[in-house]
Amino acid sequence: PSRGLGDVYKRQIWRWPLACALAFSAAAWSEAVSLERNQAEVQAVTFKNPVVWADVPDPDVIRVGDYFYMVSTTMHLMPGAPVMRSRDLVNWETVSYLFDELHETPKYDMEEGTVYGRGQWATSIRYHDGKFYALFSPNDVPYRSFVYTTDDPAKGWTLHSRMKHFHDASLFFDDDGRVYVFYGTGQLTELEADLSGVKEGGVDMTLQVRDEEEKGLLEGSRVIKHDGKYYLLMISWPNGGKRRQLCYRADKITGPYEKKVILCDNFAGFPYVGQGTIVDDAKGNWYGVIFQDRGGVGRVLTLSPCHWIDGWPMLGDEDGR
């Protein structure tokens, strides 16, 4: 199997002090900003971006207790899908990988060709009823998804099930016990409650997420439920524009959904930031964890404040800048 980035990740701890001098501003995200502590209290916190100077594509982040857990993309490199842990969203430690090797095709062993740039992409990580779940779909034949589970990410993962391919998927456990996956350009499919496969006769539909602006690719699904509403985050490349982070919200999981651009800005002189998720800490503060393309370095990890304004999770400032 291929080696490289996985070895860089393995047992590596990144240390960037939380009190560094560079943070976000309304224009360039380079000045200190205030992060909301609650409706009555505001406290200034600064940090340096990128918080991880390494390739951390397609991040998904959850919080379980005092720890944040993040999973990223390694494509053809193995061991694959690093799972990282942090107490502050800045200092991350790799605690495991979802898998040591994939054997879907001889190409993973460089036989009958190669899978460079393909393999494992855009994993979704979730925690439900005392168990961690991770779902991803390799971007190559035979185009099927993997579901891995564990009771403790630091102790390794077990393959739970295989099912159809879901591009850039987001696994979602609803309050009523039903389980769904959002993927592609607004696709929504219901799964069996035990994640053994697609639920026969369950929800299987395409949400109305396209409009006059959104005629191109939409991907990078990340879903949360907040104050009774469903929030679907995706990225888009509008015609003639640059990548931006969108949010769709609805009162019902099947919609209808309304759209808001929650992040659209350059950062530190590099192309627009886009694709990631939002997460809260134990005190109720919210943050955006988003990657940014940095050429040969890869897709570095950035951290931004997330302010709930009129029911929308705005990243950076109130205008998504």
Q: Predicted regions span which residues?
A:
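Bacterial N-terminal signal peptides
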Residues: P17-S25
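Bacterial N-terminal signal peptides that target proteins for export
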Residues: K10-P17
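Single conserved hydrophobic/aromatic residue that forms the stacking wall/gate
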Residues: P1-Y9
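Carbohydrate-active catalytic/glycan-binding domains of CAZyme proteins
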Residues: K10, W29-R321
